[in-house]
Amino acid sequence: MKKSLSAILLLALLPVQAAFAEPRSEVVRVDVPDNKTAQNGLPAVMQRELERAMALVHNHQTAEAMPLLNRLVGQADAELRRHKNVRAAGNRVHTLRLLLEAANSGRDTEVVSSEWLMPRYVRAFARVEQKNYAAAAAELDAVLAVASYEPQFLAERGQVANAMKDFAAAERTFKRLHESAKTLPDPAQAAFYQGAALRGLGYGAVERGQWQAAEQYYRQALQLNPNDRAAQNELQFVRQHRR
């Protein structure tokens, strides 16, 4: 099955993310499970340009990528403004959840594909590459204001918070990710993002000297995936420091 645009971008940008998110661990390339329920909302021309921008970011050419990303973000934002009280989702479960919330609040809401937020998401990666974590956080906060349950956005926001040493914000975000991931319709996606949340929580616990909590998080990650090398490495690190 053809991978969604989100999965393609995540695969290419993982090394960029890993460079700042897990400084003690060996960089582990992970095959992000395909989101079988995601819809490709972006027009083909925008998809091609976004993939080109992503390739530039991957090759550390953020200065060259930024003009292209700025244009794509502008185009995507213009599309989002066409919709009333717009929200975004990447699967049917999250779409229904957003519509139910809107119905309960008495607000008319239009839910579009989360693909429309990918240009800003990739621009956040570019900010990370530039070590401009505050700008990356602002980009991701804007994304999450529209797509509050999408796991890739929550995961990156938590990583940025950890990089900024805002561990309270990181903890809140990763706990949101952990809960959101449980609702994903694809079991591989659900396990992958729950593991990412637990590793993010473990990292923050280590940085705050909460060794027991960190060990528990990494153990939970390994219960989900015994072959999670990043969790294995971090658990070994924690055990060495608890002796």
What annotation goes with each model-predicted range?
Residues 45, 116, 149-150, 184, ...:
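Residue-level recognition of tetratricopeptide repeat
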Residues 37-39, 76-114, 179-191:
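Flexible helix-coil transition and linker loops at the boundaries of alpha-helical arrays
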